[in-house]
Amino acid sequence: MKIIEKKYIKDNENVQGYYSGKYLLYQLGISKVKPKTIEIYSNNETQRSKVVNICGKRLLLHKPRTKIDKFNASVLCFLELMNGIDTETLDEYKRKLISDYIAENRITQRQITKYIPFFPDKTCRNLIESEVIYRVPQ
């Protein structure tokens, strides 16, 4: 995993990507099932998406919606989470896990407002329907 981290997520202090999809759900504890494929958005990917195998791990790599850096990676990751989440399955426990991520990464409404135009309308709809937006500080 260190090779994957260094190549696609973070090389020293240079943040260039983040985990997404079912793997992110697993990392946050929202899903108990460890997926076979690790989904990553990375500046080091130029194609819209492609599958590669590294160190016996299957990766689904995506070109980012906008350039990723240490200042925006956590909010982009959060918005990607909200884009793909099934709001019907969100219970209070899962909302709490998402709230914890928001707090740990100090995500603000101002950051969300800045980056949400890069995401589909579904992302904004999911933020509201899940009521997660009300847990984000101004």
Predicted ranges, named:
Residues 1-10:
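Short beta-edge/loop segments at beta->alpha junctions of small alpha/beta modules
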Residues 2-3, 56, 90:
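A generic structural signal for ordered alpha-helices
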Residues 13-54:
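Short gly/ser-rich loop at a beta-strand->alpha-helix junction or flexible surface loop bordering the NTP-binding
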Residues 62-138:
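Hydrophobic alpha-helical interaction segments
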